[in-house]
Amino acid sequence: MRTVSSYGVELRKQNIPIRQTLDIYRSAVSCLIEIYAQIWDELAVITEPKNRFNTAEHLVHTTKKNQARFDFDLRFPKMPSYLRRAAIQHALGSVSSYKTRMELWKKTDQKGGRPKLVCDNHAMPVFYRDVMYREDTEEKDGACLKLYDGHGWKWFRVSLSHTDMEYLRKNWAGKKAAAPVLEKRHRKYFLRFSYTEEVPLTKTPVKEQIICSVDLGLNTDAVCTIMRADGTVLGRKFIDFPSEKDRMYRVLGRISRFQRKHGSAQVKSRWAYAKRLNTELGRKIAGAVTGYAEENHVDVIVFEYLEIKGKISGRKKQKLHLWRKRDIQKRCEHQAHRRGMRISRICAWNTSRLAYDGSGTVVRDPGNHSLCTFQNGKRYNCDLSASYNIGARYFIRELLKPIPVTERSLLEAKVPSVKRRISCVYADLRELFLEMELLRAA
């Protein structure tokens, strides 16, 4: 499987014309968007992307054999060719997207707002190697960038963050790297390097697999269970970062008190800080989950399928929890694929509501929602019970999938609860695996 990872290296503060370069590149993209919007009917006839791009470039760039129709070269003289082509590609994509959205809007009887062609863009330039970007031979943590200083395009030596460069040298040496892209975050500039890897994913048969079932809860950040196909539990781990959550909840409390006094008009920066804390917490949880799975030589990491698309009603705290769950699953998926592990998702209905031993629904403690009481009086951790059920539902699905219909009907007759996936629990997996072994022995 091909995986693409990226890492941003901070540009140290120094007197280089980064802002001027960014402004002229965005101005060039805006100019090209206006040009191609006027003559899109001519370009739309050309279906081949490469031919369309060549035609678009000939319209704005003059050569010995071509006279441009528009004065783009006069407005942006001596712009590097690779940077000009990147701007052309960005402009073509913007206009094409606008035209497609406009057609869809007309087909839907003009429901919703009319699409707009936005020329004021947030495009970021790409520093192509050897043409726009060179590694500094004199300084280990330096590079040379071709920037616009207000008069022309010149080479400038820049210093990069030592810790960021050490990370790249340690973890990404020898990997295929793409051209770096300029990025601005929190009033700082970064060069984002992208790396491509070819990683073979595990192909272990289901009955020999070891999985890590993960329950992302509100009380504990994550509960991981290492499980085999017969239901044997090899390990359990509670992942929690209480200090980080306390810091975030203190910030949310300050936001709440501020909004009660002054309204919600001036809390944008405070919410941005809370979101950054939430994102950092998601990174730590995802790293802990994949690290624990790798320690136990796991083949598949199993999550609940969370229906978190669209608008979510409720308090901001709950929204932050849902944002973090989505972020954790995305990060875990990427990190697991880099390590050769697979990701699977199961139906989340009733995983926490039903006891893992098959005794029925659980009753959560009113004071501590992480603990619950089973119908038989047993006290247990609710998130741990849910992680057992998550792993069991994965194995029940994968064990029954390749079996012929007649054999599956016999098994479902002996274990009726596996017919409905939303009611399957850990005890059903143990019973199903035992019946499969008896059927095979017979």
Segment roles from a protein language model:
Residues 1-442:
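Nucleic-acid substrate recognition interfaces
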